[in-house]
C-alpha cells in the first residue's frame, strides 16, 4: 500500500473568514446540560479495541472492527466495500488496538482528505464547489465533513438564523438508526470553523455518499466517500437529505443540481 502521506493531504487554500480545522471540534460552551452531555461524549474514548496481532484487520470474523474496507490493488487504495454495508457501523482500528498501524487495512478516514481536490467557482451552483483533478474510484474516501459539533438547541438556532438572514446553510444532521430506532444524532456546522468538506454542494443524484465513521470517540466523523467512479474535473456532491429521504425537510431554497430526478428543492435532515 502507498504511504498514507502520499495519498492524503490537508493543506487546502480556504477563505480567510473560516478557521480551517482538521477534524470536528466542540461548539463554544453555552453552559447548558445538553452541551455538557455533548462534551462528555466528545472527551470519551471508545473502549472496543481489536486484539489482532499484526494482521490486516480485513475480516469481521477475525477483527471486531474489520470487514467494511477493501484494498483495491489496481488503484493501490483502500475503499469502502459496499454502501449497503454501512448499515453496520464503520469502526476503524486506532492506536489502542492490538494490530500494527503498518499492516492494518482498517484505517482510512483517520488519515485525512485525499489529494487533488480543488475548491472552485461552480457556475451550476453559483457559489463555491469542490471538484477532483483526477479520477476517483468508487468507494474511495474523499474527506471528512468537519466543523463545529452542535447541540440540537444550538443547531435549531443557527438554522433559524441562516433562514432569516438568507445565509448559506452549512449545518448537517446525521441520524444513525439500529432496527429502525434512532440511536444517535450528530450535527456538524462548518460555517465558522471547517475543512474542505464544507464546499460540497447538494445533488439529488450525487456522486458521493456520507457515512458515520468512528475511530476512538463515540461521536462519529462524517466521512464522505465516492458513491461511484468519478471522472477528473467532476464536481463532488452528496445528498443533503441523508439516510432517510422520506423524512427530509425543505430548506426553502430552489435546488440547482439539474439532475433528471431533481425534486426542485434543497433538502436537509429534520432535527427532532
Ligand atoms: C455546505 S454549503 C456548500 C458550499 C457553498 N456552495 C459555498 O459557496 O460555500 C451549502 C450551501 O451551498 C448552496 N447549495 C448547495 N447545494 C445547492 C443546490 N443543490 N442548489 C442550490 N444551492 C445549493 C446553498 O446556498 C447551501 O446553503
Where are the model-predicted features located?
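Accessory low-complexity/Zn-finger-associated flanking regions
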Residues: 1-127, 254, 259-272
Amino acid at each position: 500500500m502507498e504511504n498514507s502521506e502520499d495519498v492524503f493531504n490537508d493543506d487546502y487554500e480556504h477563505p480567510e473568514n473560516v478557521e480551517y480545522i482538521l477534524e470536528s471540534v466542540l461548539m463554544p460552551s453555552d453552559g447548558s446540560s445538553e452541551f455538557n452531555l455533548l462534551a462528555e461524549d466528545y472527551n470519551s474514548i471508545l473502549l472496543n479495541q481489536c486484539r489482532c496481532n499484526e494482521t490486516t484487520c480485513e475480516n469481521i470474523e477475525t477483527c471486531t472492527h474489520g470487514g467494511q474496507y477493501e484494498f483495491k490493488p489496481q488503484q493501490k487504495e483502500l475503499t469502502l466495500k459496499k454502501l449497503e454495508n454501512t448499515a453496520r457501523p464503520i469502526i476503524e482500528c486506532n492506536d489502542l488496538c492490538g494490530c500494527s498501524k503498518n499492516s492494518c487495512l482498517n484505517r482510512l478516514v483517520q488519515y485525512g482528505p485525499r489529494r487533488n481536490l480543488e475548491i472552485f467557482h461552480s457556475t451550476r451552483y453559483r457559489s463555491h464547489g469542490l471538484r477532483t483533478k483526477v479520477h476517483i474510484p468508487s468507494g474511495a474516501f474523499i474527506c471528512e465533513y468537519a466543523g463545529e459539533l452542535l447541540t440540537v438547541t444550538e443547531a435549531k438556532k443557527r438554522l433559524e438564523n441562516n433562514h432569516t438572514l438568507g445565509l448559506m446553510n452549512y449545518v448537517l444532521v446525521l441520524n444513525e438508526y439500529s432496527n429502525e430506532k434512532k440511536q444517535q444524532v450528530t450535527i456538524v456546522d462548518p460555517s465558522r470553523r471547517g475543512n474542505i468538506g464544507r464546499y460540497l454542494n447538494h445533488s439529488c443524484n450525487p456522486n458521493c455518499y456520507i457515512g458515520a465513521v468512528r475511530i476512538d470517540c463515540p461521536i462519529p466523523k462524517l466521512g464522505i466517500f465516492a458513491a461511484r467512479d468519478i471522472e477528473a474535473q467532476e464536481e463532488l456532491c452528496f445528498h443533503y437529505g441523508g439516510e432517510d429521504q422520506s423524512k427530509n425537510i425543505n430548506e426553502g431554497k430552489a435546488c440547482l443540481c439539474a439532475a433528471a430526478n431533481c425534486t426542485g428543492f434543497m433538502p436537509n435532515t429534520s432535527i427532532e
